[in-house]
Amino acid sequence: MNYKIALIRGDGIGPEVVGEAVKVMEAIGEKFGHTFTYTDVLMGGCAIDAVGKSYPDGTAEACKACDAVLLGAVGGPKWGHASAPEKRPETALLSIRRDLGLYANLRPAVLRPAMADACPLKKETAEKGIDLMMVRELTGGIYFGKRDRYQTED
């Protein structure tokens, strides 16, 4: 089976992480008979540098045309002081989450019993190991909202 994957390499460590993830996917494909077609998509600081805005036209459409999106990392200190929303990498994250209808990030936390000594939890808890999945909701509240400033006469 062939899968179309949108690659958003992004900024900072993102290109390296995505590059290594592609190697893993290729190994999985060889073992299980899958093939992958990759489409590179610009988003974040690298998009600001290339086309002047963090969420270029066509980004959502390119991602929607694929079976999955592999996102590296977006943002960094180079772009952290821009005042215009289209020049801030995190606005691209909010936009793509909205446009793709994404609800949550899944953040696994696993502690193997062999690593108990490196954990700040009580020894009797850490020795049992931990296998926890955090679900971080993305669609509402202050986390998702746009930044605005209001000035009053008072």
Model-flagged regions — what are they?
Residues 13-18:
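Short N-terminal binding/cap micro-motifs at the start of the first secondary-structure element
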Residues 19-32:
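Short catalytic helix/loop segments, enriched in acidic residues and glycine
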Residues 41:
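The conserved SAM/SAH-binding core of class I Rossmann-like methyltransferase domains
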